[in-house]
Every structure is written in structure tokens, then in C-alpha cells.
């Protein structure tokens, strides 16, 4: 089993797809990486030679921030926005949507479950 950036790549998948299991690498970056390292995208992970794995590992480490480093950077950026008090930081702090979505309805995932409001009752039929 090939191991790149701390992730075990699935043996049965094509290399182009398997690389997307690494956080920070999608289909586009996967294709770019394979082109730069001269690895055939249709090769299965189990068929990769040790030399190809080393080339892929070196290329990814040299050119991309992935996995833990990328996660740390994202968290640091969010923390910095919260500290300087910009609009996005305030939205993060209040656990509301950050990218301009509506909140009058929807946004339940970000806001959490509904909370009952004391004193408000539905009008009954007479």
C-alpha cells in the first residue's frame, strides 16, 4: 500500500483518483502532479514502482501544502480573522454562515438545532 503525506492510498484505484484521498489535493492538482512526475494516470496504485512513489512523494512535499499543514493554516487564518474582528471573524465567532448566505430560514446546520422560545405558543382553533 502506497503511503503519501501520511495517507494510505487505496490499492485498487487509479492513481489519479487515489491522490484525491490526500486533503488538499483534488482532481486538478492530481492531474498536474502526475503530469509533472511523468506517471501514467491510468496506473493502479498497486502497480506503481517504488521509484514512482518516491517521485510523487517528493513532488507533493515540495509543491503543495497538504493534510496537517493545510489544516493548521486554515485554522490559523480563521483564528486571525476572529482576533482582528473583521466581518468574517464575527460570523465565525457567532457560529453563523460566513459567505453571505441567508439566515432567516435555513442555515440549520451551522446554527444548530432549534431552541424553544419561552412564552410563545401557537394559536389554537376555536
UniProtKB/Swiss-Prot annotation:
Q: Which GO terms describe its biological process?
A: translation
At the top level of its lineage, which domain of life is listed? Answer: Bacteria
Q: Does the keyword Ribosomal protein apply?
A: yes
Sorted keywords for this record are: Ribonucleoprotein, Ribosomal protein, RNA-binding, rRNA-binding, tRNA-binding
Q: Which GO terms describe its cellular component?
A: cytosol; small ribosomal subunit
Where do transmembrane segments lie in this chain?
Answer: none
Write down the SUPFAM superfamilies for this protein, in alphabetical order: S13-like H2TH domain
Region feature Disordered, mapped onto this chain: 95-126
Q: Name one GO molecular function term.
A: structural constituent of ribosome
* Oligomer status and interactors: Part of the 30S ribosomal subunit. Forms a loose heterodimer with protein S19. Forms two bridges to the 50S subunit in the 70S ribosome.
The record ties this protein, via HAMAP family, to:
Ribosomal_uS13
User: Belongs to which family?
Assistant: Belongs to the universal ribosomal protein uS13 family.
Q: Its function?
A: Located at the top of the head of the 30S subunit, it contacts several helices of the 16S rRNA. In the 70S ribosome it contacts the 23S rRNA (bridge B1a) and protein L5 of the 50S subunit (bridge B1b), connecting the 2 subunits; these bridges are implicated in subunit movement. Contacts the tRNAs in the A and P-sites.
- Provide the protein name: Small ribosomal subunit protein uS13
Organism whose genome encodes this protein: Frankia casuarinae (strain DSM 45818 / CECT 9043 / HFP020203 / CcI3)
Instruction: Quote the gene name from the UniProt entry.
Output: rpsM
Amino acid at each position: 500500500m502506497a503511503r503519501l503525506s501520511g495517507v494510505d492510498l487505496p490499492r485498487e484505484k487509479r492513481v489519479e483518483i487515489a491522490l484525491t484521498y490526500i486533503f488538499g489535493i483534488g482532481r486538478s492538482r492530481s492531474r498536474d502532479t502526475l503530469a509533472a512526475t511523468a506517471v501514467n494516470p491510468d496506473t493502479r496504485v498497486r502497480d506503481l514502482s517504488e521509484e514512482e512513489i518516491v517521485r510523487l512523494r517528493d513532488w507533493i512535499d515540495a509543491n503543495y501544502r497538504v493534510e496537517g499543514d493545510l489544516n493548521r493554516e486554515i485554522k490559523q487564518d480563521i483564528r486571525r480573522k476572529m482576533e482582528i474582528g473583521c466581518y468574517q471573524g464575527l460570523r465565525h465567532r457567532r457560529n453563523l454562515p460566513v459567505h453571505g448566505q441567508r439566515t432567516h430560514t435555513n442555515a440549520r446546520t451551522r446554527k444548530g438545532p432549534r431552541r424553544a422560545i419561552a412564552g410563545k405558543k401557537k394559536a389554537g382553533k376555536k
